[in-house]
Amino acid sequence: MQHDLPSRFDRRPTRQIQVGTVAVGGDAPISVQSMTTTKTADVEGTLAQIYALAAAGADIVRCTCNEIEAAEALAHIVPRSPVPIVADIHHQYRMALAALEAGVDCLRLNPGNIRKPAHIKAVA
């Protein structure tokens, strides 16, 4: 199947950040990111998916952190991961704090779900 895709994409100017060892944004190379589908509390199953994603070319992997068991599991997952781990946070700002304590490389907050200024300040 033939696609008429441009050979070059125009990129918006953005600020570069580091997600673990991977530069993202700015003029950094485009990175591949994916997300696990396991319950993060399943440490071995989640690590198996992370290793498979890394072998397939993922530079960064996101794991959901929607309950305390997931946050606790991240403390065991992060040091064994071959790629930087991003905690995907949904509604509870305390999960973001727990994920940071577990050593994740970055947080992804669903826009608008953490609204109280005190909660935003605690995470920032």
Model-identified regions with their sequence ranges:
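Alpha/beta enzyme core
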Residues: 2-4, 9-63, 67-124
